[in-house]
Amino acid sequence: MNKPAVSRIANILKNSKNFFLATTDGKRPYVRPFNAVVEYDDKVYFYTNNRTHAFKQIETNPFVELCAMIGEGYDRWLRVSGKVEYDYREEVKKAMLDANPELRSMYSEDDKIFYVFYLSNMSATIHSTQTEPEEIC
């Protein structure tokens, strides 16, 4: 994926108060708020821990979707979908923790429950109630 697209997606997610991750257990969809993201190695990274329902659902079905509102209004949003790929490198965990220092009260780089991931085969589109969808990647 090209760097401008990655940076644009990361910036939209960083600037949204929260964004939402959708998973499924094979029968039902589940959505929960997320709020930590980091751009690293030309990828957008997120985190979870291996004690959550989200982690278990991702293990069953690694295809997820994210959604974030853009700006202050309610007429634009970003949808991102792809396949979760875990990255076990400590430097990626460090980048996540450095970009989101509030996580340091819960996790460390060598923490065995802290999982950092990116989306492979990522597609991202900005939707609006006023205009046609804009494909980012």
Name every feature range the model reports, one short phrase each:
Residues 37-73:
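A short mixed-secondary-structure module that forms the rim of ligand-binding clefts
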Residues 28, 74-76, 127:
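Short glycine/serine/proline-enriched coil/turn segments at secondary-structure junctions
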Residues 78-137:
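Charged, gly/pro-rich active-site loop segments
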Residues 11-26, 64-68:
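A short, Trp-centered hydrophobic/proline-enriched beta-strand micro-motif
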Residues 15-17, 40-42, 60-64, 74-82, ...:
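A generic structural signal for short beta-strands and their flanking turns/coil linkers
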Residues 18-46:
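N-terminal leader/targeting helix
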Residues 4-7, 48-54, 101-102:
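Charged, amphipathic alpha-helical segments
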